[in-house]
């Protein structure tokens, strides 16, 4: 489960495996 404050698309620490996380990351990018 991805925490909101852990959502990131960094190559080193990725937390975008969940669909919601992906959408959030895409929105940020």
Swiss-Prot record:
Keywords in alphabetical order: Amidation, Disulfide bond, Ion channel impairing toxin, Knottin, Neurotoxin, Potassium channel impairing toxin, Secreted, Toxin, Voltage-gated potassium channel impairing toxin, Voltage-gated sodium channel impairing toxin
Cystine pairings recorded for this chain: 2-16, 9-21, 15-25
Residues found modified as Leucine amide: 29
Gene Ontology terms, MF aspect: potassium channel regulator activity; sodium channel regulator activity; toxin activity
SUPFAM superfamilies associated with the record: omega toxin-like
Protein function: Inhibits the voltage-gated sodium channels Nav1.1/SCN1A (IC(50)=360 nM), Nav1.2/SCN2A (IC(50)=600 nM), Nav1.3/SCN3A (IC(50)=1280), Nav1.4/SCN4A (IC(50)=330 nM), Nav1.6/SCN8A (IC(50)=1200 nM), Nav1.7/SCN9A (IC(50)=1-40 nM), and voltage-gated potassium channels Kv11.1/KCNH2 (IC(50)=4.8 uM). Induces analgesia in mammals. This analgesia is mediated by a non-opioid receptor related mechanism.
Family classification: Belongs to the neurotoxin 30 (phrixotoxin) family.
Domain observations: The presence of a 'disulfide through disulfide knot' structurally defines this protein as a knottin.
Name of the protein in question: Beta-theraphotoxin-Gr1b
UniProt lineage: Eukaryota, Metazoa, Ecdysozoa, Arthropoda, Chelicerata
